[in-house]
Amino acid sequence: MTPLVQAEFWDGDPDIDAICRLSKKPIVKFKHFEPFTTYQLTPFNSQNTFLHRSVLKYYSVFPYTGRMDDIWGAYVMQYHFPNSVLFNKATVYQARNPQDLVKNLENEVIGYRNTLNLLNNLKDYMSLLPEKTVEYFNIYQKYFN
């Protein structure tokens, strides 16, 4: 496995979905662990994450996708570079800014409705992303040619 993405965890107030935040209100403190990877497709956060230059053309935080922006970007990157994500211990503490959890939930509905279809048909991701997201990603990728 050649790690091209190193996603480091964070202690404190995690970036989780609104349902979990509303029901659990977690504050986390991770115990020390060794870096790990998986051969499964996995989301990773855009925060506290290091990317090798070779993946930059294929990874972006996608606009017009609600709160799926970094999650769907991570899946698309892994379509092009499978088995390339390494997870590491927490190296930062996150104190989240105040948020409207109902608005967050509304912005997550696109994911509840479309993520499984995206994962099952990842090779066709350009036809599954919102039209404005595809327009953006095409422009973004031109800067790497």
How does the language model describe each region?
Residues 2-145:
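C-terminal catalytic/acceptor-binding lobe
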